[in-house]
A protein has these predicted regions:
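N-terminal beta-alpha lobe that positions the nucleotide/phosphoryl donor
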Residues: 1-129, 136-138, 210-235, 251, ...
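Extended active-site and interfacial segments that coordinate phosphate-rich ligands
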Residues: 27, 87-114, 139-199, 253-263
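Short beta-strand segments
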Residues: 71, 131, 158-160
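Short, ordered coil/turn segments that flank beta-strands lining enzyme active or ligand-binding pockets
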Residues: 84, 148, 245
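Conserved catalytic alpha/beta cores of large enzymes that bind or transform nucleotide phosphates
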Residues: 159-239, 244-246
Length: 263
């Protein structure tokens, strides 16, 4: 409990009950994934108005293994009317509880950044998600509704080696997999000269790996099936950020599909 403000850090299950106005869009999306029984890395939410110190942060993340990803969760982001993907702050690779305070401060401050205000038109109330950062060897984004064609009979899966910010930020051309509900897969491979590390550092890939497939067919199908489960639970088209930690598939974010445009 944050003694100064009387606002407790919340588990994702508690965040679902608290509601989006208290925990923001990103946290609410994760909470809904957990409620559906889908695989999400362990996380805790600092609700809007949380004002704790280092000891409060250490207590909040007890039981969550470092490293941590500290992620802003603004009220109104990732709603069906708009997505603020990439507009607010995420601090990756936080290795100790002593480093959590500055990371949380950066996320809270991003609510008033010029970039975010120009996107959403106002300073948004901000919560923060502190999540175990898995060692992602491959990452991506998947769409239950194709953002180019508008077709809903295939799941579009985009994937790169390394950390997924390369796709979200537009810095890496991903492999693209179109997966039918019957499990058929069509692949368009891309040359991927770099992989993004959690620190943000770009690592050059060996020449023989640059054109290699990021996902096997069965892995693309596994992603597509979880996306369909999320779509059913959310009640409409979604895009989902995911990663593979070795062979284990994790979902990192889920939001409604908000716009049509080239992937």
């Amino acid at each position: 409990m944050d003694a100064a403000a009387g606002i407790a850090a919340l588990s994702l299950a508690e965040a679902a009950r608290a509601g989006e106005a208290a925990v923001g869009g990103k946290a609410m999306g994760l909470a809904r994934l957990v409620a559906l029984g889908l695989p999400v890395p362990a996380a805790v939410v600092l609700p809007v108005g949380w004002r704790g110190g280092d000891s409060d942060l250490a207590a909040a993340v007890e039981g969550i293994r470092p490293p941590f990803a500290v992620r802003s969760s603004a009220v109104g982001e990732d709603s069906s009317g708009r997505s603020a993907a990439g507009q607010f702050e995420t601090v990756s690779g936080v290795r100790t509880t002593a480093d959590l305070g500055p990371a949380v401060t950066r996320c809270l401050a991003s609510a008033g950044s010029a970039r975010a205000e120009s996107y959403v038109g106002e300073t948004a109330p901000m919560a923060v998600v502190i999540q175990h950062q898995v060692a992602a060897g491959r990452s991506g984004v998947a769409f239950s509704l194709d953002p180019v064609t508008g077709r809903g009979d295939e799941v579009l899966v985009e994937a790169v080696f390394g950390h997924g910010e390369g796709i979200v930020g537009g810095g890496v051309d991903p492999d693209r997999y179109r997966v039918t509900d019957a499990g058929a897969v069509r692949v368009r491979r891309a040359v991927k000269p770099i992989a993004l590390e959690p620190s943000g550092r770009r690592r050059k890939l060996p020449a023989e790996r640059q054109a290699a497939r990021t996902l096997r067919d069965d892995e693309a199908v596994a992603v597509a099936r979880l996306v369909r489960e999320a779509e059913a639970g959310f009640g409409g088209p979604v895009d989902v950020e995911f990663c593979f930690e070795a062979a284990r598939l994790w979902l990192l974010q889920c939001r409604p599909v908000t716009a049509m445009g080239a992937p």
